[in-house]
């Protein structure tokens, strides 16, 4: 499983402290919502500058980690 901590951070100064992909203002929540709505990974990558292929599995790993706790 991918180590989501390499790609995701929380900072109270960025997006009200929601988990975001490092160096961006793209929230994990946003990506997970789009995936749940059926948006393809490639569409997300094409439409959101700063989003990289490794961010998709990192978002899923983060969600799995949160659900385990």
Where are these regions (language model features)?
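Long, charge-rich, low-complexity alpha-helical segments
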Residues: 26-69
């Amino acid at each position: 499983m991918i180590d989501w901590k390499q790609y995701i951070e929380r900072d109270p100064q960025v997006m009200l402290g929601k988990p975001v992909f490092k160096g961006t203002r793209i929230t994990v929540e946003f990506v997970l919502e789009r995936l749940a709505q059926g948006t393809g990974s490639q569409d997300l990558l094409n439409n959101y500058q700063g989003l990289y292929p490794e961010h998709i599995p990192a978002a899923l790993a983060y969600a799995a980690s949160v659900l385990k706790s």
